Amino acid sequence: MTADPATRICPLRPQDHAAWLPLWRGYQSFYEVDIPSEVSASTWARLLDPAEPVAGALAWNGPAAVGLVHHIRHRSCWTTGDYCYLQDLFVSPAVRGSGIGRKLIEHVYAEAAREGCARVYWLTHETNATAMRLYDRVADRSGFVQYRKNLLPGVFRPAKEA
């Protein structure tokens, strides 16, 4: 299935909050996490602040928002150009497989190139086989394994533990 040619990818605007929030919650539900509302409010404010290195976009099919993407530009010790971390990507279940995920990724590629970034990269859960089929077509697997240590207990918690 291919994306509807009328699907538009548009940078987030203040008036998009009501369309963004259900997608943001759907993304959290997909990964079985419960992000506190104050963190979501801070995230929204950062996404709209041009002084912040984070940005986002929504995919629109007509009047309906059907996908979101957030990305963060940051310095790298390996290049003089910045890197772009594609942190969040979510497409409504009803339109998955239609090419919207690819369009959102391509939007990030274009934004990162415009900003002079040397690389776009992202993570996904090892069980997200459907998404990985797309990712294998639009990027290269790095072979790296992520390790992490949460330093602020309770700020980011699985929904099962909330």
Language-model-detected regions and their locations in the chain:
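A short helix-loop-beta-strand connector motif used in the catalytic cores of GNAT acetyltransferases and
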Residues: R46-L58, Y85, R141-G143
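Conserved acetyl-CoA-binding loop-helix of GNAT-fold acetyltransferases
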Residues: V91, G97-A110
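A conserved beta-turn-beta hairpin within the catalytic core of GNAT-like acetyltransferases
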Residues: A64, H74-L86, R96, G143
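Conserved active-site alpha-helix within GNAT-family acetyltransferase domains
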Residues: R102, E126-V145
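Conserved GNAT acetyl-CoA-binding A-motif
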Residues: A113-L123
